[in-house]
Design a protein with these regions (language model features):
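Short, compositionally biased leader-like segments
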Residues: 2-27
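Charged, gly/pro-rich active-site loop segments
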Residues: 11-13, 104-186
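Short, basic/aromatic recognition patches
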Residues: 18-42
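A generic local secondary-structure boundary/capping motif
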Residues: 32-34, 84, 148-153
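Short beta-strand segments
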Residues: 38-76, 106-107
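Short, structured patches in soluble enzyme cores that scaffold and shape functional sites
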Residues: 47, 75, 97-99, 164-167
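A short mixed-secondary-structure module that forms the rim of ligand-binding clefts
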Residues: 61-103
Length: 186
């Protein structure tokens, strides 16, 4: 939230007759990026503490809001303590979605990360993500136990991290790596 109590990224001004008008910028991600996020990707969440020391941990699932403005990643509370502490303290987050079989990679950054309990249906999202990731790395020769070890999280240990992407980058190896993505035209 902004100091004025409005969600970050929301702009207000007064029309001549004094009626407030709210304008939301277009979402930073569009159907192409959502399609990549929905694929069998590896999801890595990064944060930093007040001394600028980085922390990172693998997420165990992900979801994009219907309006494409918010991204949620699911994390194991017990194995992600440092990242979650950073996010609670400063809200700064970077998330990388990378498809192991193709190296297609998207990085999203935000400043408003919020740690929250999971919601009804989130456990199913996490389970589906695990099964898809097992298939993805299975095609690369890794057996199921590798994925289950990497993505180990029990329902009582899951937390959701919600954030608004404020910057997006194509991180797929090649000539466009590091290129910033523009907001999606509405």
């Amino acid at each position: 939230m902004s100091p004025a109590g409005r969600p970050k990224g929301e702009f207000r001004w007064a029309k001549p007759e004094g009626t407030p008008v709210t304008v939301n910028p277009p979402p930073l991600i569009g159907p192409e990026q959502v399609a990549l996020i929905a694929r069998r990707v590896s999801v890595i969440v990064a944060s930093r503490d007040s001394a600028h020391r980085p922390h990172l941990m693998r997420a165990v699932g992900r979801r994009v809001s219907a309006d494409l403005r918010r991204v949620t990643v699911f994390m194991s509370a017990s194995s992600s303590a440092a990242v979650l502490a950073d996010l609670r303290a400063n809200g700064l987050i970077a998330v990388v979605f990378s498809e192991p079989s193709t190296n297609r990679t998207l990085q999203l950054k935000g400043r408003d990360a919020m740690v929250a309990p999971i919601e009804p249906g989130d456990e199913a999202v996490v389970q589906t993500y695990l099964l898809h990731f097992i298939d993805e790395i299975g095609e690369l020769g890794f057996n199921e136990s590798v994925a289950r070890t990497m993505l180990c999280a029990t329902p009582g240990d899951l937390l959701a991290v919600h954030f608004t992407p404020e910057a997006a980058f194509d991180q797929t190896p090649g000539p466009k790596a590091g290129q910033a993505l523009s907001p999606v035209a509405g």
